[in-house]
């Protein structure tokens, strides 16, 4: 190649002879880097392996020539002198084609062609090798990837040449010299410019389609690999698009596919529970279809404290009504004279004050009987002290009846002490049964004294002492219940509180609540 160039040197003149030296060095340096048809072309990439462009460094795909332009600003002057020397050797003006009028680099090759034809070179020689040049250009057009990968090294090696390194004409000239060193690229200048523009457009399109789509495929690759052919269809279309040189149509369908797949991967139960929990904490309604679950939870959360508050209000109301009802629960029989009621009013008030807190069992049982289906039974388990002034107040009303009342109280206390061991066996009874037993015993005790009074023929005069005795019996029975409860609590081990509703057996209770008729 060097010998042929030396042989052509006398006929070409000084400019062309000085130009071939650097091109020879460039071809030697780039010869090992140029790919062949079976090494890097797309014909060998149709297999299962990935495209070779994706294995390169992306920074070398588009070389940055700004540094070379800044370092060699004087190459433009050399090119101008070079073109001027070529013009001086021309005997007549040269007609430049319309396509090459906008490119100053092509003007150099055209005028050099005319100079060689005028000096006696064979004009048909370039046309003989034009088939090889077009074949090489077609090969360069088919695999544009090696041109992108090795463009940095080409531009770096052209740095020492006399021509401008950023001249795009150097690429086509280099490809022509590679096919045949003797063939000159001057005859195919117009075809080279068209091919060069096509190469640039294809390179830009390939960068936009392959590189950018590679980034999106890498992003959607881990998610689409799990799902089968539905998710592989967009990526397969993206790979086949650069091969067929057709623009992509399906990238807008990528985000909906990804969003649907991400929605399928979610656990909707956990999301609903978390949204409901967030609404309970923040007090805001959950958006969308979750509002019914959140409202259901809010209703449940409201029902629990509202029911609790309502129950506590009912308990407080019951306590207040018990304290009020204990004052007016017991009434005197209808056939009792008015003077007897006034005489016994003091003892009744004293017994109510002392026994209103100690014995709410019968009054509560009467109140619960009025409410037929009451769900709760309240029993007062507080320990109460035995009043000391009960017997003096109760016996201070009449001097004639004081001895009888004391005897009845002593008998009632003795009966209660005798029945207290047997009452411990009734601990297994429920509170309601105990209250019913007390109420039944109390009603029997109040009904027995009225029977002799109704049988007597002497109505008015004989009725007054008996009614008085009946009223005293009711008052004494209430005091006996209080005393019996206190004596039973005193006998419990370790001071354990005991419900006031614990009563002895029916026989013992009847004996304790009903004194003998001889004492009346």
Curated annotation (Swiss-Prot):
- Tissue specificity field: Expressed in respiratory ciliated cells (at protein level).
**Alphabetically, which GO biological process terms does the record hold?**
outer dynein arm assembly
Give the chief site where it resides.
Answer: other
GO MF terms, alphabetically ordered? dynein complex binding
Localization annotation: Dynein axonemal particle; Cytoplasm
Task: Provide ranges: composition bias, Polar residues.
Answer: 420-437
Region span, Disordered: 93-202, 217-256, 328-366, 388-520
Any Pfam family hit: DAAP1
Phosphoserine (modified residue): where?
Answer: 161, 351
State where composition is biased (Basic and acidic residues): 111-125
Keyword Phosphoprotein attached: yes
Keyword Phosphoprotein in annotation:
yes
Q: Where is the composition biased (Acidic residues)?
A: 401-410
Gene Ontology CC terms, in alphabetical order: cytoplasm; dynein axonemal particle
Q: Name the keywords, alphabetized.
A: Cytoplasm, Phosphoprotein
Describe its function. In cyliated cells, dynein axonemal particle-specific protein required for deployment of ODA to the axoneme. Interacts with outer dynein arm (ODA) subunits.
Record protein name field? Dynein axonemal assembly factor 8
Query: Which species does this protein come from?
Result: Homo sapiens
Q: What is the lineage of its organism?
A: Eukaryota, Metazoa, Chordata, Craniata, Vertebrata
């Amino acid at each position: 190649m060097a010998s042929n160039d030396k042989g052509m040197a006398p006929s070409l003149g000084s400019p062309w002879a000085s130009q071939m030296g650097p091109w020879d060095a460039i071809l030697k340096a780039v010869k090992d880097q140029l790919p062949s048809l079976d090494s890097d072309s797309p014909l060998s990439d149709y297999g299962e392996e990935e495209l070779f462009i994706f294995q390169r460094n992306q920074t070398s795909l588009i070389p940055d020539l700004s540094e070379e332009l800044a370092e060699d600003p004087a190459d433009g002057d050399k090119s101008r002198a070079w073109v001027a020397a070529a013009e001086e050797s021309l005997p007549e003006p040269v007609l430049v084609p319309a396509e090459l009028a906008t490119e100053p680099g092509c003007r150099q090759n055209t005028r050099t062609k005319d100079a060689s034809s005028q000096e006696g070179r064979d004009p048909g020689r370039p046309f003989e090798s034009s088939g090889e040049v077009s074949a090489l250009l077609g090969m360069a057009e088919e695999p544009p990837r090696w041109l992108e990968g090795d463009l940095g090294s080409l531009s770096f090696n052209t740095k020492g040449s006399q021509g401008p390194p950023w001249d795009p004409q150097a690429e086509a000239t280099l490809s022509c010299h590679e096919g045949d060193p003797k063939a000159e690229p001057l005859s195919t200048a117009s075809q080279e410019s068209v091919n060069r523009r096509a190469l640039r457009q294809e390179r830009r399109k390939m960068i936009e389609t392959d590189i950018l789509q590679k980034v999106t495929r890498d992003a959607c690759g881990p998610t689409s690999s799990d799902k089968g052919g539905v998710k592989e269809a967009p990526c397969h279309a993206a790979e086949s698009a650069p091969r067929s040189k057709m623009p992509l149509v399906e990238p807008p369908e990528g985000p909906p596919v990804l969003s649907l797949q991400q929605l399928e991967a979610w656990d909707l139960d956990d999301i609903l529970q978390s949204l409901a929990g967030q609404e309970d904490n923040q007090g805001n309604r959950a958006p969308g279809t979750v509002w019914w679950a959140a409202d259901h939870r809010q209703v449940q959360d409201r029902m629990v404290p509202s029911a609790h508050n309502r129950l506590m209000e009912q308990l407080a109301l019951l306590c207040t009504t018990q304290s009020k009802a204990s004052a007016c629960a017991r009434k005197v029989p209808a056939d009792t004279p008015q003077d007897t009621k006034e005489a016994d009013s003091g003892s009744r008030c004293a017994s109510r004050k002392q026994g209103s807190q100690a014995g709410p069992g019968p009054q509560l049982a009467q109140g619960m009987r009025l409410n037929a289906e009451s769900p709760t039974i309240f029993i007062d388990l507080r320990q109460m002290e035995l009043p000391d002034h009960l017997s003096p107040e109760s016996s201070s009303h009449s001097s004639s009846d004081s001895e009888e009342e004391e005897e009845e109280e002593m008998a009632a206390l003795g009966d209660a002490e005798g029945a207290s061991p047997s009452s411990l066996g009734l601990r297994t009874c429920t509170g309601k049964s105990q209250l019913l037993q007390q109420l039944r015993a109390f009603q029997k005790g109040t009904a027995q004294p009225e029977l002799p009074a109704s049988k007597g023929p002497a109505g008015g005069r004989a009725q007054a002492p008996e009614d008085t005795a009946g009223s005293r019996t009711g008052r004494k029975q209430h005091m006996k219940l209080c005393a019996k409860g206190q004596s039973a609590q005193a006998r419990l081990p370790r001071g354990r509180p005991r419900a006031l509703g614990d009563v002895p057996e029916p026989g013992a209770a009847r004996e304790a609540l009903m004194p003998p008729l001889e004492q009346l």
